[in-house]
């Protein structure tokens, strides 16, 4: 069976927290084995690779991630920016703002109704702060990265763009969430990937599927939420999200219609007159 017969498959990990006292090495080993059997198109690691941003923590998590064979998009989280950890991140993983694109062969492009896919990862962390921020100075760069009109477009950041239920008082949503959401809506982004709260949850906002991932390898869990990570499938008509659990279960969690998404976008329209009269959106 050729790759053209498969949907676009994305593995979403976040909040690994290597160095954390409750870090589960066996859980990480299982993830490596399962991901390598799966062979997704890309792995997105949406921040908090480490517990406190120390060099040894980064080096340990880099060994684990190097064992995963597919291409990776890796961005830091707030824990990774502690103790000047962004220096170690850059040495081991490269730029904190990065892009990965893969073009589809003609058969797969026809099957998926897209020319390829683009993943843009952006660092939402500030050193030694739990709060997140992207910043309007980064918006032109983000806009430039999504340059293929017919791609499946995915944006990744660590901090959540939309509040996550069951996570207590909301204090860590990114500070420019409104401006960023407006930008991503205008760019016709299909999927937003984030982490931070250690709770998996999903929202549909302005036609965007927002996927928050849990922690797959620690016991820093809220309520009865088990460790988990996300597997995302995109085909011509749907986006499906499966949760993988530490006990080996794989559970279908979300089905999003791509056809309905297009209808929602067309049914919700802010007029040019309104936008011209109320120029508050960051460019």
Task: Annotate the PLM regions.
Residues 2-11, 110-121, 147-152, 205-210:
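Beta-strand-turn-beta hairpins that frame and shape the catalytic cleft
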Residues 59-141, 183-185, 231:
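Extended active-site neighborhood of metal-dependent phosphoesterases/phosphodiesterases
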Residues 236-283:
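A short C-terminal boundary segment appended to hydrolase-like catalytic domains
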């Amino acid at each position: 069976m050729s790759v053209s017969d498969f949907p676009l498959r994305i593995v979403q990990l976040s909040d690994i927290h290597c160095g954390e006292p409750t870090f589960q090495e066996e859980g990480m080993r299982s993830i490596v084995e399962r991901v390598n059997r799966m062979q997704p198109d890309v792995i997105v690691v949406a921040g908090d690779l480490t517990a406190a941003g120390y060099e040894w923590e980064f080096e340990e998590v880099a060994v684990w991630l190097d064992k995963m064979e597919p291409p990776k998009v890796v961005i830091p989280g707030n824990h990774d920016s502690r103790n000047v950890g962004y220096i170690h991140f850059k040495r081991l993983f490269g730029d904190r703002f990065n892009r990965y694109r893969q073009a589809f062969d003609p058969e797969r492009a026809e099957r998926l109704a897209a020319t390829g896919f683009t993943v843009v990862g952006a660092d939402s962390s500030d050193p030694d702060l739990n709060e997140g921020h992207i910043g309007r100075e980064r918006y032109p760069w983000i806009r430039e990265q999504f340059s293929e009109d017919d791609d499946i477009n995915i944006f990744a950041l660590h901090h959540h763009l939309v509040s996550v239920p069951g996570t207590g008082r909301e204090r860590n949503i990114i500070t420019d969430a409104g401006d960023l959401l407006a930008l991503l809506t205008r760019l016709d982004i299909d999927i937003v990937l984030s982490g931070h709260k250690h709770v998996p949850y999903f929202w549909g906002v302005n036609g965007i599927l927002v996927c928050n991932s849990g922690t797959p390898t620690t016991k820093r869990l809220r309520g009865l939420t088990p460790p988990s990570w996300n597997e995302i499938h995109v085909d011509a008509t749907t986006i499906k999200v499966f949760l993988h659990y530490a006990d080996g279960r794989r559970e279908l969690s979300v089905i999003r219609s791509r056809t309905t998404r297009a209808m929602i976008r067309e049914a919700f329209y802010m007029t040019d007159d309104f936008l011209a009269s109320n120029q508050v959106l960051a460019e």
